Swiss-Prot record:
Role, per record: Involved in the TonB-dependent uptake of copper and iron under conditions in which the concentration of copper exceeds that of the iron.
InterPro entries, alphabetized: AMIN_dom, Plug_dom, TonB-dep_rcpt-like, TonB-dep_rcpt_b-brl, TonB_rcpt_b-brl_sf
One function term, GO molecular function aspect: copper ion transmembrane transporter activity
Protein name per its UniProtKB record: Iron and copper transporter IacT
TM regions (residue ranges): none
Organism: Nostoc sp. (strain PCC 7120 / SAG 25.82 / UTEX 2576)
One GO-annotated biological process of the protein: cellular response to nitrogen starvation
Amino acid sequence: MVFVECGAALKLNQCIYIGIASTICLLITQKANAQEKPVNTKNIGLITNIPRLSDIERPPTSVKDWLSQSAPTPPKIKITGVRINRTDDNFEIILETPDGEISAPETLQEGNIFIADIPNAVLALPEGKEFREDTPVDGISYVTVTQQESNNTVRVTIASSGKLPPIQVVNQSNGLTIALTPTSPDIELIVTAQKRPEDAQDVPLSLTVIPQQEIEDAQIRSFQDIANNTPNFSFLPTTAGSADFSYYSVRGLNNFNFLANQDTVGFYIDDVPFDYGGFLDVGLIDLERVEVLRGPQSTLYGRSSPAGVVNVISRPPSNQPEMRISALYGSYNNRELQLSLSDAIIPDKLAFRLAGAYNARDGVFDNTFLNKPIGERSQLTGRAQILWTPTPEWNISFNAYASDNDNGNPTFSRQNAENPFQVSQEVDGFHRLSTNTQALKISYNGDGFRATSITTRRFSNQNTLVGDNFPGDLLQQIIGINSTLWSQEFRLQSPESADRLRWLLGGYYESRNFNVLDDTFKYSDAGAVFFGLPASGSDRVSAEQNRHTYAIFGQIDYKPIAPLTLFAGWRYETADAELDRRRVFVNPDGTANPPTAEVRNATLNSDAFIPRFGLQYRFNPNLMAYATIAKGYRPSGFNYRADTEDTRRFQEETTWTYEAGLKSSWLDDRLSANLSIFQSDVDNYQVLLTDDFGFFRNVTNANVKVTGLEFELKANPLQGLDLIAGIGYVDSKFKNYRNSFTNRDFSNNRVPFAPELTYNLAVQYRSPGGIFARAELRGYGITYFDDANQVKQDPYALVNARIGYEGEKYGIYLYANNLFDTRYITSGFLFPPPNVTAGFGDPVTYGVRVSASF
């Protein structure tokens, strides 16, 4: 391939251009003889195109056959019961009869449908009912057992949401058993990244999917855990145990500019957009899967996201009684309890699901000044879901969830400290965050089209007190912020059965009220002297920002020939922003100086047309190539901390990303390997600047160029043995960037919080006897934490391990994280210059976890 041939001789960005051009040439010359793997998840109309076994034309019978047919017909066998038996490895459909063995059925498999017709049988269930169960296990849409009156047969129908797993039919002494063993990972990798159900290997973009079983095995409970299992995605807390703010980066673009109005990455939980990086510390519980889309996503999602999307999908309400519980205890008095339960209120019509979690941990830092541990944390999370399905075409769901975080002071140390977890500071601070969310989703899935409406409200409230982390108490920072976000998204799109032409049209509205109630630096007498102030006191800023965003978006996918798909998408977005802001200095006696730099009703508007183009070509059912060109966009905004008009506004940011990739699967889907290469050119990247004392007060714009690649591999070489690996490389550098306040030139410096290398490797084994073992390696390349590239973390790697025993309905596990107690920093800054003050990651931790399901 051209990717290998050009690697030694050319730079990565040159490889990208050659790769895209070669891919297009290869696609044009390839024969049109491959078909895309079919995926169908609709619960109605699936059997209409499958001929009845009795309707298939049979050859004329012979005299011998005619004579044999004249013999007395044996009595019909009554099927008096249908049971579903679930285990960790498979599930069984058991047909019970008091009359003895059931005749061997005729079977037919068509796409994702399996049919078994049992001759000379009658369905005699209580009250004469037929049997149906929706979603009996993950990956199976429904199971039905019905009477076929025309030919005295009983039909069993199994519909899979993806590829059918292996199915075995076994006659028993008192009935018939149909057993399904989902050994292929495809059954778990049906995704909705493009707002339609499809195999992850058919999606023409760089995509990481973490299915439910992997979520449990890797113990994914936060966005940081998701990033640890995703190439070119880093998610770093400010310091160990901290939840006040987390720095993330996808493909070299980060959220370091926390004064910006919109994040670079779109975070969604059950279709609800999250509005600010400081509000992302939510517990992720009772999940079905996670999808991480890298690259600009503006033509299929309500909110425009220039770097990518993290899409979290919770487990939906079940039509059958279900209960799960898990508990954990570990180092630093770490304790966790999770509970979820689900059942039908009205069978097949109305169901509910409840989930909740509590976790808490003592601080990992020892404060010798106060003689107590600090940096403790606690979190309480709850979620409630109601799902109403009045007809097979309609789904109406209401979700509500809330979280409450009460954490200790974010604690920092000198980067070169002998023991960074031992500090001496006077202030015992805190960080408190509470959020609540409500969402109403109405979906129609018809034969001619699909329609979706999503209405959401999200409220967040944050209060923080932070000391300077050193003896002497020079200053304290006090922050009080709340945010209310309303959004409405509507989508109209082609039906799931559409193949040659697929289309989507959507609209989006968002209203966000962001209130800075208090952003204060409180200086002591010593602090006033150190920072050159005339007297001690509190420098207080308050502000209110309102933003209204309107957008229309859409995409068309067209197949001119069977293996080739061309797609084009577009988005038009406009946003209006308004700012009120005041700054006062409050003296120690409580009197306030006259306000300075007061702003009222400042307004700005920005708009953009955002296109996306691409193609994909399926060489055969196991190999697909794609190439895309996409624009990303972040609107202009206000910096509420700025004192002057020329620094108060920053410009809109645009990104052009060029990407080419290959997706492949081998050995009956037991091995998958995906590769993508990309280049992003960013104009007016929104950059956060510090003043002479290291405080973040200003925002400017700079140009950035990013090149990189991602490679992911999953393998199941032996039954029970799984290998998961991923690696991402990114070269993200400033271009033509000079700090206008200090006149320092940062051109060709690396963008902060964007590790050059990210990698993850997991090897796990689950034995038939119940033994479970898993080892993980995750690492980062060199990472800088400032534009000047003066504060950095050298490459490092962490090792995690788990071992346990699993029964049919329970499990008990021992775990160790950061097994070799590696020291590393997750943030850093010059304070007071030239000293480096840093936040350190968690030390080694151990613990035990138990889980059970009912």
